[in-house]
Amino acid sequence: MSKTTSSDDSRDGEGDKRLRSTTKSTWLSFLKSIATFSGDLSSLTAPSFILSSTSLIEYSAYWAEHPELFISLPRGETPLERQLLVTKWFASTLKNQYAARNERYGSEKKPLNPILGELFTGKWNTDIGEDTELTSEQVSHHPPITAYHIYNKKAGVRLEGYNGHKSGFSGPQIHVKQIGHARLILEPHNEVYYITFPLVTLEGLWYGSPYIELGKKSYIISTSGYLTTIEYSGKGYFTGKKNTFKATIVNAKTKSEPIYRIEGSWTGMLKYCTFEDQKRSAWEDFLDCGNYKPVNISVAPIEEQGEYESRRVWKNFAVALDAGDYAAASQEKSKIEEGQRELRRQEEEHNEVWHRKYFEWKDKDEGFEEATKCLRQPVKEGFWYYLR
């Protein structure tokens, strides 16, 4: 197995530095085209120079890039302690998922839309002698949806979920509504934590340096009765700070006053205190998101990967893009996309459907619906279940 981070760490970078002066006019033309587009922006073909050489399917690895936190979740002695640990682990996933590329390269890049059936698998080594394993599959292309399953058998920690998105242009921003939810299972305690996702806003478009800000709320709802509500906000024209994170933990069953408050930046320092003692001296460090380094995922070398594994699918495109040869990159991308269109035509002609390898859709997730009753409106939503 070869080691590399699951994000754009090893493959995006040099192309960024060559980008701005040579492609500024093309960038502005692209912005004008999306400003007049009324549908879901994910269906648009983006020019190669704004693309990442990493497929969106790899983003599922961000959930476990701090494997020591992931496997430690069952160690909390009480349901409340475990709720706090799960909240800390979730907060640790945000920076790399939404901000690391901008900090590393100076601007956000559009990840590649995975092809239907695309796979990304790998594992993290841990100090308990059992690997944490990831399996992710692109289960839908229109709309794009990735299903994923992350498991450490010895620790008894399992995460499964699916992410899709719908995006639209609004003024100077692109808003991305994340579709789906995740379920974190702590097997030693027979607990399930249902996780929803924040709104993603792409800022800085007209300056040619796009970056991500998070908005609205997301929730972590435990079958033990505890609820974490996280509110995200960013810097406005006159007020606010970038990447603001404010959370409360309550017992949703008893509808008590909040027990904990957690505040700070999801790219910097988070502090917490009990709700009863909110004096400044009572706030303690919760998580230093800015200096919490991710752990690389191990993936098979490209030459050992199957034909649908992500880095093999996009190998030629990535080589061309990293060399700054945007014409060749566009040609390679078009070749892949046309091959997919031909497969769909053949399936339609022979009245066939694509069969998913690892996941199965069910129209109901009754546990999620029951858990979200503690919110103002319960959420009725299906789920992509992992085929064990």
From Swiss-Prot:
GO terms for biological process: intermembrane lipid transfer; lipid metabolic process; sterol transport. InterPro entries: OSBP_sf (IPR037239), Oxysterol-bd (IPR000648), Oxysterol-bd_CS (IPR018494). It comes from the Eukaryota. Pfam families: Oxysterol_BP (PF01237). SUPFAM superfamilies: Oxysterol-binding protein-like. One of its GO terms (molecular function) is oxysterol binding. Keywords: Lipid transport, Lipid-binding, Transport. GO terms for cellular component: cell division site; cytosol; membrane. Lipid transporter involved in lipid countertransport between the Golgi complex and membranes of the endoplasmic reticulum: specifically exchanges sterol with phosphatidylinositol 4-phosphate (PI4P), delivering sterol to the Golgi in exchange for PI4P, which is degraded by the SAC1 phosphatase in the endoplasmic reticulum. Belongs to the OSBP family. This is Protein kes1. It comes from Schizosaccharomyces pombe (strain 972 / ATCC 24843).
